[in-house]
Design a protein with these regions (language model features):
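Walker A/P-loop-proximal flanking segment of P-loop NTPase domains
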Residues: 1-35, 39-48, 52-62
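Mid-core helix/loop region of P-loop NTP-binding domains shared across ATPases and GTPases
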Residues: 100-136, 140, 155-157
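Single conserved hydrophobic/aromatic residue that forms the stacking wall/gate
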Residues: 162-171
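Short loop/turn elements that form and flank the Walker-type P-loop nucleotide-binding site
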Residues: 22-23, 68-69, 127-130
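Residues immediately C-terminal
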Residues: 141-144, 169
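P-loop NTPase motor core
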Residues: 58-99
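Alpha-helical scaffold elements adjacent to nucleotide-binding pockets in ATP/GTP-utilizing enzyme cores
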Residues: 31, 35, 39-47, 88-100, ...
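Conserved ATPase-coupling elements of RecA-like P-loop NTPase cores
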Residues: 143-153
Length: 171
């Protein structure tokens, strides 16, 4: 909406966004750097959080009839890319999850016997089906950051896979 508000060039691809948003599926977009992934994610965020409010005058306005407002969490993994050990990465990832999911009702209890990831997965189970949209940007940032550091790369990859597997059935 800011692009259009300031008369910047904006190519309306919201008809394609409608096609994707109309299906209850998980999508993984791999595109080159500077290829519009963040703008695409922001458009989805606006659609699922506010409906058509910020998309008036675009193709999607005449197509999208769903008036449901969703809980929307946007995770930007570039916020967790500076670390020197697997433990530090795990802490940064946990902080990213707590910070972003607390905006939609997740409450982490520090000092509890249960880990952050366990508490988070238990909280996810309490949500109504199809009530949460999770958008991930810069998913590869932590891995790119530690390229060339074989052991650290493997540990970060495993942590990301474990976290995504734990959440996969719940989201």
């Amino acid at each position: 909406s800011a692009l259009r508000q300031f008369d910047e060039i904006y190519v309306d691809k919201t008809e394609l966004i409608y096609d994707l948003a109309s299906q209850k599926s998980k999508y993984f977009f791999v595109r080159p750097r500077r290829f519009g992934k963040s703008l695409l994610i922001s458009t989805f965020e606006s659609l699922f959080k506010y409906g058509l409010k910020e998309l008036r005058g675009l193709a999607i306005e005449g197509l999208y009839k769903n008036e449901t407002k969703y809980l929307v969490v946007k995770l930007d993994f570039s916020e967790a890319k500076y670390f020197s050990s697997p433990e530090e990465f795990s802490e940064r990832l946990a902080s990213l999850i707590v910070r972003n999911f607390s905006r939609v009702g997740f409450s982490y209890v520090p000092g509890s016997a249960e880990s952050i990831f366990y508490q988070w997965s238990e909280w996810l189970k309490t949500l109504d089906s199809n009530s949460l949209v999770v958008l991930v940007d810069e998913y590869d940032s932590p891995l790119t950051y530690c390229l060339g550091q074989e052991e650290l790369f493997a540990a970060v990859r495993d942590c990301l896979l474990y976290t995504s597997d734990a959440a996969d059935d719940l989201i």
